[in-house]
Amino acid sequence: MYGLLRRLLFLLPPERVHKLVFAVLRGATAATPVRRMLTRWLGPTDPVLASTVFGVRFPGPLGLAAGFDKDGTGLDTWAAMGFGYAEVGTVTAHPQPGNPAPRLFRLPEDRALLNRMGFNNHGAGALAIRLARHHPEVPVGVNIGKTKTTPADQAVDDYRASARLVGPLASYLVVNVSSPNTPGLRDLQAVESLRPILAAVLAETSTPVLVKIAPDLSDSDVDEVADLAVELGLAGIVATNTTVSRDGLLTPGVGQLGAGGISGPPVAERSLEVLCRLYQRVGDRLTLISVGGIETAEDAWDRITAGASLLQGYTGFIYGGGLWSKHIHDGIARRLHQGGFGSLHEAVGSNAAERGRPPS
């Protein structure tokens, strides 16, 4: 059924469909009785799926990745869609329109998306007001980025301002320095640039702070960011963002679409590689959230057993439909029971030793 609906929706421009579908989801979950019914039906109800991570209780490990609900206008929607949590944003200290359209493209042969949205959002202040007015049934993290017009040498103050506004209201904060769609942003992943940003955010809030990294980092850069995260006392790392690589894509004409980051299956292999590397290096000290190319319950299970305590998806939701998160959670629960695991935590990293030696 959803396959037919998806084919019809894919006849329309992607960003228009996003706005339409998002509006429908918000409308369908606006009434409290309906929302509660959907949450009971679609949500992760098996106790084995629940876990407490950096002091926050998550009913299920799969969350909505940042980018879908940029301004937190669907805060009451995501539990009813079966997610164990949601990450809203990316928001910036100042409102901004993002990049000119068209800026979102489908790669159907790859079941992927290409976007160059550019952090279009209403600002951290507007999100803070929404967070203060709503009490979602699942944890809500906030992803913060740099305002495009803010010079790199003022990035610390920009991130600090966002953290001050939304930090007290979020379940956790993610410092996004890995989007390819804000000029110069990825340069902030260099340790000498990243250190003062993370230190400023940590000083501004007692909320757990994580950093989101790109799949295109070299292994040595991944190691340096991981070591910095441990040194500063971050809660964890989100790995990974979209990739700028075009290697192996099947959809014709991708080269004519222009710049942007690709999400979905094309990033899956590298995302898993980065996860494995991080777990071997800092998995005993940091929480790892895996995102990038998760489509099936088997994909999700691979990430958990490789070291991810939590998972996120966006593109899989687009291609998988409204039952996607339920199918993922049901599949994880089934594998936990079949494997004799008493909890999700017991399964995290259970297959890591078979994936290679720790990095030198």
Swiss-Prot record:
GO cellular component entries: cytoplasm; plasma membrane
Binding site for substrate: K70, N115, R116, M117, G118, F119, N176, N181, N241, T242
Cofactor: how bound: Binds 1 FMN per subunit.
Binding locations of FMN: A66, G67, F68, D69, K70, T90, N143, N176, K212, T240, G264, G293, Y314, T315
Keywords of the record: Cell membrane, Flavoprotein, FMN, Membrane, Oxidoreductase, Pyrimidine biosynthesis
Active site: S179 (nucleophile)
Membrane topology: Peripheral membrane protein
The protein's name in its UniProt record: Dihydroorotate dehydrogenase (quinone)
Species whose genome carries this gene: Mycobacterium marinum (strain ATCC BAA-535 / M)
Lineage start: Bacteria, Bacillati, Actinomycetota, Actinomycetes, Mycobacteriales
